[in-house]
């Protein structure tokens, strides 16, 4: 399981070094194979271990090719999906279209989300954190039935 936020840098070739604490689990449990795609609700990327991505693909197979919303979701997630492997130095090469989608600059944030990572431009991540704080204070958040029994 992946958790925590790590500041990382993109090099001039568009590579990111995955923090060391994640490299061994990714190598041992997932053979260093990942799939990177776009987040359809935020300007960030999603990095899935290949086994986890396979579960997403199984769900996508069940969606319609004729219903516009389902077709659009499939196009985005699958159209941008890129298989990759950590190199010997624990780096991933991010294809240019993915970097452009997430507006990634030199400084980025890799954020663990249990079964996947989000990859954000650092400034966009800070903005997202502020938006999340506002959302948590919103009445709609307090009325969310799925969150009613959630406590820390």
From Swiss-Prot:
GO biological process, one term: negative regulation of DNA-templated transcription initiation
Pfam families: MraZ
Keyword Cytoplasm: yes
Entry-linked PROSITE patterns: SPOVT_ABRB (PS51740)
SpoVT-AbrB domain segment(s): 5-52, 81-124
Domain of life of the source: Bacteria
Keywords, comma-separated and alphabetical: Cytoplasm, DNA-binding, Repeat, Transcription, Transcription regulation
Statement: the UniProt record of this protein carries the keyword Cytoplasm: yes
Subcellular location: Cytoplasm, Nucleoid
GO cellular component, one term: cytoplasm
Alphabetized Gene3D superfamilies for the sequence: Transcriptional regulator MraZ domain
MF annotations from Gene Ontology: DNA-binding transcription factor activity; transcription cis-regulatory region binding
PANTHER family found in the cross-reference section: TRANSCRIPTIONAL REGULATOR MRAZ (PTHR34701:SF1)
Subunit structure of this chain's protein: Forms oligomers.
Similarity comment text for this entry: Belongs to the MraZ family.
Protein name: Transcriptional regulator MraZ
Source organism of the structure: Shewanella woodyi (strain ATCC 51908 / MS32)
Underlying gene: mraZ
């Amino acid at each position: 399981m992946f958790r925590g936020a790590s500041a990382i840098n993109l090099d001039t070739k568009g590579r990111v070094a995955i923090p060391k604490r994640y490299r061994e689990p990714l190598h041992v449990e997932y053979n260093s194979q990942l799939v990177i795609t776009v987040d359809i609700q935020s300007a960030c990327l999603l990095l899935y271990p290949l086994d986890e991505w396979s579960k997403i693909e199984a769900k996508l197979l069940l969606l319609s090719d004729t219903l516009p919303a389902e077709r659009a979701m499939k196009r985005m997630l699958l159209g941008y999906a890129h298989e990759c492997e950590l190199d010997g130095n624990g780096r991933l090469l991010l294809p240019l279209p993915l970097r452009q989608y997430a507006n990634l600059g030199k400084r980025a944030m890799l954020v663990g989300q249990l079964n996947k990572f989000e990859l954000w431009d650092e400034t966009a991540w800070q903005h997202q954190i502020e938006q999340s704080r506002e959302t948590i204070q919103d009445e709609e958040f307090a009325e969310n039935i799925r969150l009613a029994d959630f406590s820390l």
